[in-house]
Amino acid sequence: ILAFGSLNLNAKWGPIAALIGLGGLIYMLDGWLVSVTKESNAGLYNLQMDKTFRWGMFWFLFSELFLFGLLIGSIIFVRFSITPWIAGQSGDASQLTHYLLWPDFVKHWPLFTPPSAAPASSSFSMESIRRIPLINLIILLCSALLLTDSRYHLKHKRYKLCRLTLNTAILLGGTFLAIQSYYFFHLMKANIIVKSGIYGSFLIAFLGLHLLNIIAALLFLFILCFRIYQNKLFAKNPFSFDAAVWWWDFLVVIWAFGFFWIF
């Protein structure tokens, strides 16, 4: 439902379907995390279960790496191979292709105006297109540093500093989510995603997938914060905190690569 609604945001029912799907996803994640937390508090997990969780998190991030790597690799191919080819900058054959098929196309990036397409009517300036992702990158980097620092304080049983740095990291993560949502929906409103061909298709896939991961990771951090305030998360059993740090750092690295190669 979430994917179907996201692909039809321009329709009247599209945002409603996307919100229903997002609500269902959050409900399922919350139910699973709460169940795991209750089982952990009841002492039902042993070293073998801890090892299983760690391997599960590893394979989850490994699969995410290939998914995001495929998306970023495809746009790198478009940027450095396809775009120069249709602009006639890749040898004699590409010059002939450019002359016969797309004589008016000029190489540019980001590829907001693909060959044989009308220019997208955009209220976004090129400066805004790059500035907002840069601001988000800085916010994510700061939140990742604070989250790592919070993990360090938890390990050394400095729970007050752990709560402070974790709360700040969550606040920065929420700020990223708000700015990114604004950015995503204004790209839609400005027709950049709808009328930019392959670049627009890539943006909706990459930004949407990354945004979903941020929402899920923030939910994870909220539950960790709640457990710390209840004095139920201690230095002796930090896997849940380790998993949150790994996931958040992974999303920061993905956004850094996306910023430098996409925008």
Which functions belong to the PLM regions below?
Residues 1-263:
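...captures the hydrophobic TM-helix bundle architecture rather than a specific catalytic motif
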